[in-house]
Amino acid sequence: MKIIHTADWHLGKILNGKQLLEDQAYILDMFVEKMKEEEPDIIVIAGDLYDTTYPSKDAIMLLEQAIGKLNLELRIPIIMISGNHDGKERLNYGASWFEHNQLFIRTDFTSINSPIEINGVNFYTLPYATVSEMKHYFEDDTIETHQQGITRCIETIAPEIDEDAVNILISHLTVQGGKTSDSERPLTIGTVESVQKGVFDIFDYVMLGHLHHPFSIEDDKIKYSGSLLQYSFSEAGQAKGYRRLTINDGIINDVFIPLKPLRQLEIISGEYNDVINEKVHVKNKDNYLHFKLKNMSHITDPMMSLKQIYPNTLALTNETFNYNEENNAIEISEKDDMSIIEMFYKHITDKELSDIQSKKIKNILENELRKED
């Protein structure tokens, strides 16, 4: 049996004001073409199909087109669950009709009680749920963390699980120790959101969404597929794609398959003048770029100048702000007022105070000292 594991499409994502629908349409077309080659028995999408609870019309159309090609044209069964970004009601609309074509949409965490059996494999679905939802459902005020809530959900099905079959869990959550990125919205506020690996011991394999790095966690049977695209500059350089899972005689193997996007996220560090004069290596001018530059404080609008050469510049950082990060041994308390001002001015402008500026500042400081006396 061959299973494809994907997640975190985040359709409708806007990165630093840039709409990514073109990039998402490109990567989904590539994914569909890959599925024609793979001919899987089933595709699993582990949450966060959309980036917002209220996706745009274009984002909805993009999902419909991709799912239509995969499920209706290629006749591939699909299981999809909701993530913390998805609007459950919108994603679940028409779910009962779609099951006639083996498109299984699960948005309620209680669906874990109703596994989907395909080719002798039991797929248990555990969509994203808040701690309060689980606490209310179980009428248990002692549930205060995701660890406690998820444990309770799995305990409810443990007595019924068929130990002679292959049992796979599909969920959207954070496993303890998983590597996070800036584009992942925290699952909870004020409670512990990560879940320990041991909670999943009764399953033969666990397919997860939420964390965007495909190797967020090192484990033989607990895997994240990662997102289809890089969605924050903290993900620059990360491979993106999907996982192929094969089951032969009860033995499970998986491999990560990378996909090449239309554009990647790239971080460029250097001197402003070198970048403007194109003396700094950029992999692809069409990539989405974050420049971290020095010596640009004298430039009125550096972002505009950069975009004339690199149209997809999405972020710009003045590296002088990090001037002392590697030299934080300097104790400000040991400096006099004038020295602190000189350091600050140099830190911000990368220039020394002029004689006139120094004299004016000294006069101001002296006047303030007289007032204190």
From Swiss-Prot:
GO terms for biological process: DNA recombination; DNA replication. The keyword Hydrolase applies. Keywords: DNA recombination, DNA replication, Endonuclease, Exonuclease, Hydrolase, Nuclease. The keyword Plastid does not apply. InterPro entries: Calcineurin-like_PHP_ApaH, DNA_Repair-Maintenance_Comp, Metallo-depent_PP-like, Mre11_N, SbcCD_nuclease, SbcD, SbcD_C. Signal peptide: none annotated. GO terms for molecular function: 3'-5' exonuclease activity; endonuclease activity. Gene3D superfamilies: 3.60.21.10. Pfam families: Metallophos, SbcD_C. NCBIfam families: sbcd, sbcd_Staph. Heterodimer of SbcC and SbcD. SbcCD cleaves DNA hairpin structures. These structures can inhibit DNA replication and are intermediates in certain DNA recombination reactions. The complex acts as a 3'->5' double strand exonuclease that can open hairpins. It also has a 5' single-strand endonuclease activity. Belongs to the SbcD family. This is Nuclease SbcCD subunit D. It comes from Staphylococcus aureus (strain Mu50 / ATCC 700699).
